[in-house]
Swiss-Prot record:
Organism (species): Streptococcus agalactiae serotype V (strain ATCC BAA-611 / 2603 V/R)
Biological process per Gene Ontology, one example term: NAD metabolic process
Protein role: Involved in the regulation of the intracellular balance of NAD and NADP, and is a key enzyme in the biosynthesis of NADP. Catalyzes specifically the phosphorylation on 2'-hydroxyl of the adenosine moiety of NAD to yield NADP.
A GO molecular-function annotation: NAD+ kinase activity
Subcellular location: Cytoplasm
Organismal lineage: Bacteria, Bacillati, Bacillota, Bacilli, Lactobacillales
Record keywords: ATP-binding, Cytoplasm, Kinase, NAD, NADP, Nucleotide-binding, Transferase
Protein name: NAD kinase
Co-factor(s): a divalent metal cation
NCBIfam families in the record: PRK04885.1 (NF003424)
GO CC list: cytoplasm
Length: 278
């Protein structure tokens, strides 16, 4: 008979917080609550649940920290500022969070993420995942690139760059560019132009395009040079990019399903509209 250690039965929890005072206070309270509770085991290396404390930026960092463990990790966010799109709890709801995790039945809410494949002229292939968005830009000169959707050349783009976002990322940079807001359960990508050049000679669609899950997007630069590619909040520079491919990843991000889950449209209202004046 194999003897079972209490850690085999306990829920393994990682607590990730930003450097703000209030976030540290919440983290300290959670550490103290979980440290001697047999239902939980603190494990930053191999967690079942990752608690992100801060804002949406902190959750993006937590996602990339555990993106190789997405099959077995669920996330939960605690916001120490105003309401965020990835957070279900406020800093004063720590006791509610602990109680809900004690009664957790393993249910989850899943959202699609972005698969990014960058091919360079020397044959190197760089693969990455994005929770919100990815952009490609050519800073010093106008970017010229073919936009290929599902192997069909859709347009030749001229402008500052192109953004591809997930539904959860549609409320971020995409919205500031005039893109549509998509509900996060929709498995689709959104392609949005960044300062496209439109005149009598050069034309682009000039509006966002919603791409279904089964289709892929290719951006094929037509000029040599250094390109700036962002993956969420990280930016890299590559010389002579042959193409960059975007599609819905086979994995998804999973959040702990909680009774206090705030609806997406409430979050949109809170972030961009607010209470009407009377």
């Amino acid at each position: 008979m194999t003897q079972m250690n209490f850690t085999d039965r306990a829920t393994r929890v990682a607590i990730i917080a930003n450097g703000k005072y209030q976030s540290k206070r919440v983290a300290s309270k959670l550490f103290a609550a979980f440290k001697h509770d047999p239902d939980f085991y603190l494990s930053k290396k191999d967690p079942d649940i990752v608690i992100s404390i801060g804002g949406d930026g902190m959750l993006l960092s937590a996602f990339h920290m555990y993106e190789k463990q997405l099959d077995k990790v669920r996330f939960v966010g605690v916001h120490t500022g105003h309401l965020g799109f990835y957070t279900d709890y406020r800093d004063f709801e720590v006791d509610t969070l602990i109680n809900n995790l004690k009664n957790d039945k393993g249910e989850q809410i899943s959202y699609p993420i972005l698969k990014v494949t960058i091919t360079l002229e020397d044959g190197r292939v760089i693969r990455a995942r994005a929770l919100n968005e990815s952009t490609i830009k050519r800073i010093e000169k106008t970017m010229v690139a073919d936009v290929v959707i599902n192997q069909v050349v859709f347009e030749r783009f001229r402008g500052d760059g192109i953004l591809v976002s997930t539904p959860t990322g549609s409320t971020a940079y995409n919205k500031s560019l005039g893109g549509a807001v998509l509900h996060p359960t929709i498995e689709a990508l959104q392609l949005t132009e960044i300062s496209s050049l439109n005149n009598r000679v050069y034309r682009t669609l000039g509006s966002s395009v919603i791409i279904p899950k089964k289709d892929a997007i290719e951006i094929v630069p037509k000029r040599v040079g250094v390109y700036t590619i962002s993956i969420d909040n990280k930016t890299v520079h590559y010389k002579n990019v042959t193409k960059i491919e975007y599609s819905i990843d086979e994995k998804s991000i999973n959040f702990v399903s909680t009774p206090s889950h705030t609806s997406f449209w409430e979050r949109v209202n809170d972030a961009f509209i607010g209470e009407p004046e009377h």
